[in-house]
Amino acid sequence: MSVNYASLRFEYERAPDHDAPASSPYPVAIVGAGPVGLATSIDLAQQGVRTVLLDNDDTVSTGSRAICFAKRTLEIFDRLGCGDRMIEKGVSWNVGKVFLQEDLVYTFNLLPETGHSRPAFINLQQYYVEGFLAERAMQLEPLQMRWKSNVIGVTQHEDHVELQVETPDGVYPLKAQYVVAADGSRSAMRKLLGLDSHGRTFKDRFLIADVKMKAPFPTERWFWFDPPFHRNQSVLLHRQPDNVWRIDFQLGWDADPVAEKQPERVIPRVKALLGEDAEFELEWVSVYTFSCLRMDDFRHGRVIFAGDCAHGVSPFGARGANSGVQDADNLAWKLKLVVNGDAPHTLLDTYASEREYAADENILNSTRATDFITPKSAVSRLFRDATLNLAKDCAFARRMANSGRLSVPAVLRDSTLNTPDKEGDVFNCAMLPGAPCVDAPVRVDDRDAWLLPQTHGGAFTGIYFCGLGHGPEVCARSLAGLSNESLPVRALIVVPRGMMCTVPGVTVVEDVEGMVAHRFDARPGTFYLLRPDQHVCARWRAFDAASVTAALKRATCNG
């Protein structure tokens, strides 16, 4: 049966806590069933953590929400069990073009090299993303999804948080060891705790028009500065599934947000871009302003903030939803270890410090893009236009031209969870401690596969690079003790092309194109330790069990 995800609704059910409050707190309650709350709840449930997901509505998001989902987000969705659905429905793209007036200034490719399983970006309406995530969540038994459940009270205690949850059947109390607030930019959780975000609001207005049409434009991101069809402003064009195109028109601060949403104002703007004879339908129209801001602290006792309620950015660069999903990715494994008693609660402080750093990076990039796109003085405008004119011929100017630095994952190089490289161990690659693991083509069990899915499962992973001089069986004996750690480490052995074999209890992958060794700057004996969120936390030129144990303790605040 075909599902209309744009109008998807979920059934409200009376919560058992109405009649008999749980005898002990739930391990985790999550407030907000957008992409961030859904991703966090799925991640926890896949690891066996009993979780309650609360949302004050019974629908998915509609209208002009997020549409650009980055490669790293897609890799996280793969781990959550719904990446393929996103790719199949979404519009994949790697290439963008920047124009000044009628002239092409430059073209960029966000994924110029081969050997990656996912594209740089897909465009996919947020209601599809939420729908696919919700359907995945409903498959997981440890997860309860409670719709039309509005949190109206929060009380923190020494060992739990008590929420007052308002439903069509009245109000009931819900206790949880930890609460994740993922209820968006207008967060009720933030207000209930008397907290706020701080930052900068930009004095400009933008019109978003989601237009249904058949158009000859390629599947690329096109951005115009001062185009002839919309003088002295900017325009962004993106393709979405179902023959829908997202068009963003800069309007200026003095534009009337109510009047500009009217069809008689929107249609002429769209026709100026497409041509007077163009046939199209307006699917959604909105006018927005935006801010770059964040909370001072993402953790407040047993309440942890993630996504838009913790930080907000302008839409230039697609850093909002993508950074929120990365919040979920960072938080879930830490919550699991803490509620299971395998790590102290101080591990959750590293969620705050790492993701506050990432938020600052996103806000900086978003602010710079906005300042370039919307110059606030004649001098700034002259600088911008001169930069764009130079960018046609000069590579250095292209690095300065900024139509939105598109989302990339944060490299947590200063994280306290990282183990510094051993003195004398020299690496020449991007896989430094704190970096997210990069993908590469491999073969597993005599079939084509990818590296990243071999690191799924919610555990730490040790990647050992085996040479031709000693077989995987010898390597496996060296790694045998890892499974006996207090937190077991899953061993993964990478062998050169043509050396594939089977070792009981160990995943052996064949580096068929040599890309794994190249991207990790690996030699025989090189060993990498990955966190459950696939970030590198340590690496060595030679495996040493005691060093791995120490790094594991450091990465879980057990040192």
Where are the regions that the model predicts?
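Helical substrate-recognition/capping region of FAD-dependent monooxygenase/halogenase enzymes
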Residues: 1-31, 46-47, 100-103, 131, ...
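FAD/FMN-dependent oxidoreductases across multiple families
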Residues: 10, 241-243, 257-323, 343, ...
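Core beta-strand elements of the Rossmann-like FAD/NAD(P) dinucleotide-binding domain
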Residues: 24, 169-178
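Glycine-rich Rossmann-fold phosphate-binding loop(s) that bind the pyrophosphate
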Residues: 33-34, 126
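Glycine-rich FAD pyrophosphate-binding loop
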Residues: 45-65
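Active-site-adjacent segment of FAD-dependent monooxygenases/related oxidoreductases
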Residues: 62-138
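Conserved FAD-binding catalytic core of PHBH/FMO-like flavoproteins
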Residues: 88, 104, 134-135, 160, ...
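A conserved short coil-to-beta-strand element within the FAD-binding core of flavoproteins
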Residues: 147-161
